[in-house]
Amino acid sequence: MKRKVLAMLVPALLVAGAANAAEIYNKDGNKVDFYGKMVGERIWSNTDDNNSENEDTSYARFGVKGESQITSELTGFGQFEYNLDASKPEGSNQEKTRLTFAGLKYNELGSFDYGRNYGVAYDAAAYTDMLVEWGGDSWASADNFMNGRTNGVATYRNSDFFGLVDGLNFAVQYQGKNSNRGVTKQNGDGYALSVDYNIEGFGFVGAYSKSDRTNEQAGDGYGDNAEVWSLAAKYDANNIYAAMMYGETRNMTVLANDHFANKTQNFEAVVQYQFDFGLRPSLGYVYSKGKDLYARDGHKGVDADRVNYIEVGTWYYFNKNMNVYTAYKFNLLDKDDAAITDAATDDQFAVGIVYQF
């Protein structure tokens, strides 16, 4: 029985970081949950001269989720999540706020919130952003328009299409201009939408977003708008998780040399199996091709692979609170392509131990 319970709990823990949250307050319709994890991790990289470099990448992550029952139909909610880098000396100021938002939910009419939250375009990328250590980096990233965690987003979400169609969900999002930062983190006004449908273990999602580029971003001559579209599908049942995603971006994806790619074509895939005794092996593939790029030497109009790797790894869950993991990244990026984008070509190996609650 313990093995069967573990097999059901682990997928939920992977998808939702707060699935194992500790309830710290629940009274008079107000509830507060506290969740987090402490991760001890080290990563080794194989350099071009066959030497190995390694670094500590340990961190801690904590969050609070609150809910207030205003009426029988109206609920207020909020969430805060914070990350602490444990690999640097004291006083290095490596902390960062991942999420901070608040909103209202009215029964089957849906929810509305505002703050720092996940961009709706990430709904498609989330299907394959499930690898052990790496993954989810073909086009999605934080503070890159509405492709990941980002600032100043107003989000409306509706589940089961107003209660009329089980499993049919949609979201609409607006992002205000953020220009008081480095050019690669800026964005103009924009909107995003996503639609997903889930039935009997299968899931399908489509997402699209379009944003104005700031004047500083548009100075590269690629255009005044940035956009992405993506489609993904998954199967999540019978201890199996398998997913694929394809997406394209325009004037949005940032290269390692801090230029924007005029266009990218991206593919990700992952398959995992959850054994009853706690082992969860994983195999993933991530690929991104850039079109009409700025090369490192300043030339424009070059095509090159941006990302190309296979990850093989596994978790072992002792229980719902404790696990260890390891992963190896086989970097397939050609050195000629890497020379254009200034991307790394090293293989990498990661090992870690996690306590989560």
Swiss-Prot record:
One GO molecular-function annotation for this sequence? porin activity
Q: Any idea where this protein resides?
A: Cell outer membrane
Q: Which SUPFAM superfamilies match?
A: Porins
Q: Which InterPro entries match?
A: Gram-neg_bact_OMP, Gram_neg_porin_domain, Porin_dom_sf, Porin_gammaproteobac, Porin_Gram-ve
Taxonomic classification: Bacteria, Pseudomonadati, Pseudomonadota, Gammaproteobacteria, Enterobacterales
Family, similarity comment: Belongs to the Gram-negative porin family.
Task: Provide one Gene Ontology cellular component.
Answer: cell outer membrane
Q: Which organism is it from?
A: Escherichia coli
Q: Which UniProt keywords apply?
A: Cell outer membrane, Ion transport, Membrane, Porin, Signal, Transmembrane, Transmembrane beta strand, Transport
| GO annotation, biological process | monoatomic ion transmembrane transport
Q: What is this protein called?
A: Outer membrane protein YedS
Membrane topology note:
Multi-pass membrane protein
What function does the entry list?
Forms pores that allow passive diffusion of small molecules across the outer membrane. Plays a role in resistance to carbapenems; this carbapenem-resistant, noncarbapenemase-producing clinical isolate has a deletion in ompF and a mutated marR gene that does not induce expression of this protein. However if this gene is overexpressed, or if wild-type marR is introduced, this leads to decreased resistance to the carbapenem antibiotics ertapenem, imipenem and meropenem.
Factors inducing expression: Expression induced by marR.
The primary location reported for this protein is membrane
Which gene does this sequence derive from? yedS
Signal peptide limits: 1-21
